[in-house]
Amino acid sequence: LYDAQTFTDSTVFKETPLYITNTLDSLKVFSLENLKEGSYKIVAMKDKAGNNKYNPAIDKIGFIDYPITVPTSDMFELELFQEKKPFKADKPTQESNNKLFLGYEGDFRNTKVTASYGNTEVPIKIGKFPSKDKDSVQIFYPNVKIDSLQISVTNKDYSKTFNAKLKDLKEADSLDIENKTGGILAFRDAFVLKSKTPITAIDESKIVLRSKDSTTVKFTSKYIDFEQEIVFDFEKKEDEKYTIELLPGAIKDFYEKANDSLKYNFSTKQLSDYGNLKINISNIKRFPFIVELLDKNEVLYKTTSNKETSVYFETIEPRQYTIRIIYDYNSDNEWTTGNYLAKKQAEEIIYFPKLIDVRANWDVEQDFILD
């Protein structure tokens, strides 16, 4: 607790509280007793440094943005959150003769990256780093012999230019297209090919999709630039085998290289191999909200509702799922953490208290009553 009369936004960073309690076990309920009458600001922290001051880089914080009056018998609920770090880029590192890695902290969205050599702008492509566990992007640059690149990174108020020294390495990234989907295509999914280098052109007239009886299947394709993925959508049939063939020249990459003849085989299962889940949600406070199905901590399925209180997950893999709902206050289709100085709470997450068992060839309907 802090004295409300002298409390400012910077107090939690600089001063220790007037009153403090903590626990070393798993208890989530705290009490403070023998307090002086008055008006207080209440803050909760997961204090990694143990100094009773808030360090947003490592600590979690929860707060109520209005003062409380002591004495009181009221119970106050505070939700802890870890703030997203402000955007900051690391110095790029060379990984091959035509690629740099750029590490960063914070949110990469709306970041602009440009490259130059001397006073000449150098064309580049930005791609997602292959590993989920690393906040980095790939910077692809032309196959030219230069000794350095000036990499400029801007994101809102952040702006910095790095001088990346380049060496003549043995390896250079080249066009390589792999089957990201694997051998089984789920009915909910599209077939996806992933390229090692950025794609600049796709000629659908040189791509053929066939079923097992060699019948040609109509499809549409789109390229997701940041992911370096080609997504194929088509009407799928049960228990069917498919072959997608890329004739020479169907794909051209950033380095003006075209593919050789490529062929990928995959199949679908029967609809009875999957389950369906309908969730009826009561006492919704606001729209939009996100509904996610998780296995352990991994989100497997996700949908957003802007007005409906019943959501459907059709043809999902049989297993036990955790259901959670997120109130998507800023409508960005993902959970957003809080910001202490901006007085923004983290978006509220509500978990269904039990695992939901979805079995093959089952239709499960579950009511979810929110508090």
Model-derived segments and spans:
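N-terminal targeting or signal-anchor segments and their processing/structural boundaries
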Residues: 1-371
